[in-house]
From Swiss-Prot:
Phosphorylated on serine and tyrosine residues. CAV1 promotes phosphorylation on Ser-23 which then targets the complex to the plasma membrane, lipid rafts and caveolae. Phosphorylation on Ser-36 appears to modulate mitosis in endothelial cells. Phosphorylation on both Tyr-19 and Tyr-27 is required for insulin-induced 'Ser-727' phosphorylation of STAT3 and its activation. Phosphorylation on Tyr-19 is required for insulin-induced phosphorylation of MAPK1 and DNA binding of STAT3. Tyrosine phosphorylation is induced by both EGF and insulin (By. similarity). PANTHER family: CAVEOLIN, CAVEOLIN-2. It is a peripheral membrane protein. Pfam families: Caveolin. It comes from Atelerix albiventris. Monomer or homodimer. Interacts with CAV1; the interaction forms a stable heterooligomeric complex that is required for targeting to lipid rafts and for caveolae formation. Tyrosine phosphorylated forms do not form heterooligomers with the Tyr-19-phosphorylated form existing as a monomer or dimer, and the Tyr-27-form as a monomer only. Interacts (tyrosine phosphorylated form) with the SH2 domain-containing proteins, RASA1, NCK1 and SRC. Interacts (tyrosine phosphorylated form) with INSR, the interaction (Tyr-27-phosphorylated form) is increased on insulin stimulation. Residues 1-86, 108-162 are cytoplasmic. Residues 87-107 dip into the membrane without crossing it. Keywords: Cell membrane, Cytoplasm, Golgi apparatus, Membrane, Nucleus, Phosphoprotein. This is Caveolin-2. The modification Phosphoserine is found at residues 20, 23, 36.
C-alpha cells in the first residue's frame, strides 16, 4: 500500500555538431540557454528549499489512505508546486530582480564611497585620538581615581556585638 517510486534512467544522445564546444553560455540563443541544464544554485544557497511530497506529507505504517488517494495527492502536490512557482516567477522574478539589483548597487556604492573612506579616516585619526585620550586620563581621571582611593582607604568599620 502506498506509492512505489522508481529511479528512471534518462540518457541524451546528441550529434557532435549540434552543440557548441565552448564552456560559456550563449545568451544570444534563448533556446540553448533554457535547455542548458546548468546549475542555477552553484553555491547551494537554497538547498533547504528542496522539499518533496514525502518531506511534507507522511503517513505512519498503521494509517494509510487508499493508494489512489495517495497517488493523486502526490501528483497534485507536485503539479501545484510546479505551476504556482512558475506563475509567481512570471510576475515577480523580473521586478524583484530589478529591485534587488538597485538595492545591492546602492549598498555597494555606499560601502565603497562613504563607509570605507569613513572607516579609513577613523583608523588614520585613531593614533592621535589615543594620544589625546592617554593625556586626558593621566591628567584628569588618574588623579581623581587616586584621590577617591585614598579617601575610601581611610574608612574603617568596627562591628560591635551588643
Amino acid at each position: 500500500m502506498g506509492l512505489e517510486t522508481e529511479k528512471a534512467d534518462v540518457q541524451l544522445f546528441m550529434d557532435d555538431d549540434s552543440y557548441s564546444h565552448h564552456s560559456g553560455v550563449d545568451y544570444g540563443d534563448p533556446e540553448k540557454f533554457v535547455d542548458s541544464g546548468q546549475d542555477r544554485d552553484p553555491h547551494r544557497l537554497n538547498s533547504h528549499l528542496k522539499v518533496g511530497f514525502e518531506d511534507v506529507i507522511a503517513e505512519p505504517m498503521n494509517m494509510h489512505s487508499f493508494d489512489k488517494v495517495w497517488i493523486c495527492s502526490h501528483a497534485l502536490f507536485e503539479i501545484s508546486k510546479y505551476v504556482i512557482y512558475k506563475f509567481l516567477t512570471v510576475f515577480l522574478a523580473i521586478p524583484l530582480a530589478f529591485t534587488a539589483g538597485i538595492l545591492f548597487a546602492t549598498l555597494s556604492c555606499l560601502h565603497i564611497w562613504i563607509i570605507m573612506p569613513f572607516v579609513k579616516t577613523c583608523l588614520m585619526v585613531l593614533p592621535s585620538v589615543q594620544t589625546i585620550w592617554r593625556s586626558v586620563t593621566d591628567v584628569i581621571i588618574a588623579p581623581l581615581c587616586t584621590s577617591i582611593g585614598r579617601i575610601c582607604s581611610s574608612v574603617s568599620l568596627q562591628v560591635s556585638h551588643d
